[in-house]
UniProtKB/Swiss-Prot annotation:
Species in which this protein is naturally found: Streptococcus pyogenes serotype M5 (strain Manfredo)
EC number of the protein: 2.7.2.3
Binding positions (ATP): 208, 296, 327, 354-357
Main location: cytoplasm
Subunit structure of this chain's protein: Monomer.
The organism's taxonomic lineage, starting at the top: Bacteria, Bacillati, Bacillota, Bacilli, Lactobacillales
InterPro entries named among the record's database cross-references: Phosphoglycerate_kinase (IPR001576), Phosphoglycerate_kinase_CS (IPR015911), Phosphoglycerate_kinase_N (IPR015824), Phosphoglycerate_kinase_sf (IPR036043)
Record protein name field: Phosphoglycerate kinase
PANTHER family: PHOSPHOGLYCERATE KINASE (PTHR11406), PHOSPHOGLYCERATE KINASE 1, CHLOROPLASTIC-RELATED (PTHR11406:SF23)
Keywords, sorted A to Z: ATP-binding, Cytoplasm, Glycolysis, Kinase, Nucleotide-binding, Transferase
Amino acid sequence: MAKLTVKDVDLKGKKVLVRVDFNVPLKDGVITNDNRITAALPTIKYIIEQGGRAILFSHLGRVKEEADKEGKSLAPVAADLAAKLGQDVVFPGVTRGSKLEEAINALEDGQVLLVENTRFEDVDGKKESKNDEELGKYWASLGDGIFVNDAFGTAHRAHASNVGISANVEKAVAGFLLENEIAYIQEAVETPERPFVAILGGSKVSDKIGVIENLLEKADKVLIGGGMTYTFYKAQGIEIGNSLVEEDKLDVAKDLLEKSNGKLILPVDSKEANAFAGYTEVRDTEGEAVSEGFLGLDIGPKSIAEFDQALTGAKTVVWNGPMGVFENPDFQAGTIDVMDAIVKQPGVKSIIGGGDSAAAAINLGRADKFSWISTGGGASMELLEGKVLPGLAALTEK
């Protein structure tokens, strides 16, 4: 990566501004998945071990009006982070003003402070999300000229807390998480060890058009699963019953198939049910066609066998999107078996592109078997699409 990293700057005695991604799920004020906090620890620990004073910024959820602030404070995150670090985390509970400034100025070397949810600034004119110039300058003024971006999950957005701060400091550098995310995903797509197989699932073709187009150029094979299968089926005149379909994307699906040169591999059967919820019958289809009154909710056993074969010998695999409704045990076989087929390949570099695929790997107990699981769904999708991420572009060149 041709950008400066946290190891390229002297941190001792400096107030170091750090954008992390602590956008974690909360239920009744309790964190239900702390992966993003854990992922930020190496960078935070490095800064404080080097004698820096870490000032952390993160958003949590969406905040558009005053009422949205309810349940969106980062207070539970501050407590969780303190427990993980084994030291106090200063939490003034505000995003600006004298209370925040005094707390920052009172920090000593090796201490950590967490600023309140950056999106609280969106209540009055979307200042965070619209990269308000004044807000970026103000937050930048709280530090000593060093900004560390370690929030891959928001790297595809130009916000005040990443791009805005970057524009107003002497050095904007990458943290370890951001550096690893870019290295794994970009290298997999741009300079893969071959054979390189991409697996794309999920419900909508529209979400993945750019990704499919880019990967058809870069990968040796692109396997398609999930709900978007049925848009590809219908584009070829195959019966899909009541399955999910994007009628306005049939021409796009047809076009992708025509220009794929045989690289695009679709399922050959499905697991179908007579309803999405409250179904009374689940069965495997004979072939591609879904029965009238039924809908496809997972890839079938023949498809699993074909995908297993397509993955044999793969040295690089990028997976984004489940094969079916994996949250339901009746429709998780495709996702489980494809995961197992990926990780059993000898010497494979296996990467999950965040989002539902990451949740599937974690929930189904396969997370530790992958080389890398991305912390950013949208950001990883844009990297897979070959786009430049604003949060990365704003960092200082080496």
